[in-house]
Amino acid sequence: MIERYTLPEMGALWSEQNKFQKWLDVELAVCEVHAEMGTIPREAVAEIKGRATFSVERINEIERTTNHDVIAFTTNLAESIGEAARFVHYGLTSSDVVDTANALLLRDSCDLLRAKIDGLMDVLKRRALEFKNTPQVGRTHGVHAEPTSFGLTFALWYDEMRRHRERLKRAKEAVAVGKISGAVGAFAHLDPIVEEKVCVRLGLKAAPVSTQIIQRDGYAEYLSTLALIASSLDKFALTVRHLQRTEVREAQERFARGQKGSSAMPHKRNPIISERICGLARVIRANSLVGMENIALWHERDISHSSAERVVLPDSTIGLDYILQKTTSLIDGLVVYPERMLENLAATRGLIFSGQLLLALTRKE
């Protein structure tokens, strides 16, 4: 995701530095388990842990020759470790490291997103209570229908986010899965106990069955969940955009001192935050389709998923993190015009009560 839409904490989580740190965490956990089981010398593991460092710049430099990022990474580790480096990556294939590290990144991302959802729900609850007795005309097909409460809108959104919080919990369970099963997933050079112990150390579940990679339906579930959440935020923002139209003007985004609406029309106050939320939601929805496309791979694995995941996993996660914060700020600072709501209620001169009249006539003898 471009820097413009990247918040610091989530951006740091998805940085190259943190990605390689997670790779190192996996490699070290495997070394420690091997040492416990007597596969490699304990003193070698102590040396590896004490000396292992990496440089993103150096890894990129090596990769220009190897054209393989994991080999570039382990080569750079070997430069700092020395002789004991021969035990790093012992029995592993690249996806053991990459997929298990991805599980750590996605798990931590879910925790940050969950906190953002909780913050949005707090604001929605407060505003629902604030406007529970504020009458507003309800609209169906964009046309005045019957009276409702503006607070009911926020209550509806609160309940929707409650469901999303549960969906995100399930998505976290789907992606917080590691695998240390080697090439084609057959444990040819590894004891399955290694996988179990490594995953426990890292706070992950071990994949019950894997090929050379963790199966991508879990990633697809994660990306689809993010798309669902983004779609709700899209809906919230779209409602604000409608309410801010000049002809309606029942609510509008907070307009800060010094903010400008147009380079040509200085009177304009545009719902730019809402429009930005709607736009980024489209990106997140589109990325969920890529997650589904990545499920069908050749036999025990191919690498067609890799290039796509390098884009859609961070972009969808960072993008949703951003629009969650923007939606929270939008709702928190939303300027509401109850008087205008009353004017719009009266605009049809009582026609919005036609349903009441219909029932009265039906009951008439």
Located regions from the model:
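Glycine-rich cofactor/substrate-binding loops
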Residues: 1-22, 26, 46, 62-66, ...
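A structural signal for small-residue-enriched, beta-sheet-centric alpha/beta enzyme cores
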Residues: 186, 201, 206-213, 342, ...
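A helix-coil-helix interface module used to build multimeric assemblies
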Residues: 1-187, 191-197, 206, 259-262, ...
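Generic, well-ordered alpha-helical scaffold segments in large soluble proteins
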Residues: 33, 76, 80, 123, ...
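Short, well-ordered beta-strand elements within core beta-sheets of diverse protein domains
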Residues: 152, 220-228, 356-364
